[in-house]
């Protein structure tokens, strides 16, 4: 059951609101006619939500809300008023109210909206209680994030059991700020790298600590406050409900995000997404460079944090390992916060080249581990024959071109054979990719 305290000095409105809300069997309604009476009740009883009028004698709705905040009472609070305007709405929400609702001439509509707000709060509270039953941690890699690390730590929800902040040899005030927050919040556990090891190594350190302390789920969020904690339930629910083992963010559904990206980054992101699909075998995933992720303890133990690539590219490396060992992954659409003082340490030209080499190495390792050693699949031959055919096609084509230029020799026969080899090679490769896609679909069932 969900308990609601109504506060309104108008007895008719109070009674009408009570009657309407009591039609919902999940709600238990209590009421009082003044803020003073509400404060007395709150000294003896805990409610799940408070619905208060704004204009009341002696103490108005906002003053009641501020008094409760001062007393440390964080009960969700809805201002329900007939004296509304945009300025008041802004003041109410800035004061910490959960929702703001104006009374209208259509009682059925306004009470239905009020009930929906109450149900949204109830759902959120039940969700958070469910999360508290799990040992959920957040790993935050931080390198020279003095501007935003404090804001990031402040935003972590209460249902997160542990926060591992990994300082990767920062040279600014980042370590000092982390220590200050750790003194105020017992959930925060600082980890310090004396030498810069890379963002992948920082996350691996956090993952290892999470395993050592028995965490059930480990979430990764950047230290620059770009990753909105409001999306955490979307990342956690598929894992808690045992639908997947790994969730990874997808910003590419957001048009504003794509619109604001430099052209070189758009092209680079598209190329790396394609290469990661091929290398990892997760053909349905988008935005593999996204660092906003959540992973189960079981998956984390299997991939072994110490084997994670230490620099940028770690997220692609993790995907390859997860697919190789048969874990399910899912994209979570979300928006990110930009232009808040963050800065990127990625040099995209060198990053794309370096990551392409890593993906080739990981791809060959996955084929060996997954389709030769663990469970043999003929797609390995398709890839092999495809690559050999394409290479022979290129060599034969170049040789024919050389003969034509050097000796004016006829190239028709050789060119035809080269083209046939090319098409045959592409067919082999595409069939191999198709079989790989089918493996992913079967793994997701």
Region roles according to the model:
Residues 189, 193-212, 217, 229-312, ...:
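Acceptor/aglycone-binding surface of glycosyltransferases and processive sugar-polymer synthases
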Residues 31-40, 61, 171:
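Helix N-cap/capping motif at the beta->alpha junctions
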Residues 167-176:
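A conserved acidic beta->alpha catalytic loop
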Residues 63, 84-101:
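Alpha4 helix (beta4-alpha4-beta5 surface) of REC/receiver domains from two-component response regulators
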């Amino acid at each position: 059951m969900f308990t609601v305290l109504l506060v309104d000095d108008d007895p008719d409105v109070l009674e009408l609101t009570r009657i309407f809300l009591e039609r919902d069997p999940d709600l238990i309604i209590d009421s009082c006619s003044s803020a003073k009476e509400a404060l007395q009740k709150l000294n003896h009883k805990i409610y799940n939500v408070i619905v208060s009028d704004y204009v009341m004698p002696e103490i108005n709705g906002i003053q009641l809300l501020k008094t409760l905040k001062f007393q440390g009472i964080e009960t969700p609070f809805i201002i329900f008023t007939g004296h509304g305007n945009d300025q008041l709405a802004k003041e109410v929400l800035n004061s910490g109210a959960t929702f703001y609702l104006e009374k209208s001439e259509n009682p059925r509509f306004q009470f239905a909206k009020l009930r929906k707000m109450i149900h949204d709060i109830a759902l959120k509270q039940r969700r958070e209680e469910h999360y508290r039953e799990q040992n959920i941690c957040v790993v935050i890699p931080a390198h020279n994030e003095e501007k935003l690390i404090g804001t990031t730590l402040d935003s972590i929800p209460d249902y997160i059991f542990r926060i591992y902040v990994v300082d990767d040899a920062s040279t600014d005030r980042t370590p000092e700020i982390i220590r200050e927050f750790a003194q105020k919040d017992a959930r925060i556990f600082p980890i310090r790298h004396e030498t810069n090891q890379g963002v992948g190594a920082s996350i691996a350190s956090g993952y290892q600590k999470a395993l050592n302390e028995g965490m059930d789920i480990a979430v990764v969020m950047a230290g620059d406050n770009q990753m909105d904690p409001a999306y955490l339930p979307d990342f956690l629910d598929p894992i808690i409900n045992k639908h997947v083992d790994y969730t990874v963010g997808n910003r590419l559904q957001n048009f504003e995000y794509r619109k604001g990206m430099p052209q070189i980054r758009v092209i680079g992101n598209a190329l790396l997404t394609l290469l990661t699909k091929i290398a990892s075998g997760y053909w349905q995933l988008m935005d593999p460079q996204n660092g906003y992720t959540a992973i189960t303890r079981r998956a984390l133990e299997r991939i072994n944090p110490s084997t994670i690539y230490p620099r940028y590219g770690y997220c692609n490396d993790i995907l390859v390992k997860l697919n190789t060992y048969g874990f399910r992954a899912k994209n979570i659409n979300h928006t990110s916060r930009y232009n808040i003082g963050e800065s990127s340490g990625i040099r995209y030209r060198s990053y794309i080249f370096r990551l392409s080499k890593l993906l080739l190495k990981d791809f060959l390792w996955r084929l060996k581990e997954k389709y030769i050693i663990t469970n043999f699949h003929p797609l390995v031959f398709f890839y092999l024959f495809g690559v050999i055919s394409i290479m022979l096609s290129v060599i034969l084509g170049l040789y024919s071109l050389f003969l034509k230029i050097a000796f004016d020799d006829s190239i028709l026969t050789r060119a035809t054979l080269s083209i046939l080899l090319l098409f045959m090679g592409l067919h082999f490769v595409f069939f191999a990719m198709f079989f790989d896609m089918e493996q992913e679909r079967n793994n997701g069932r």
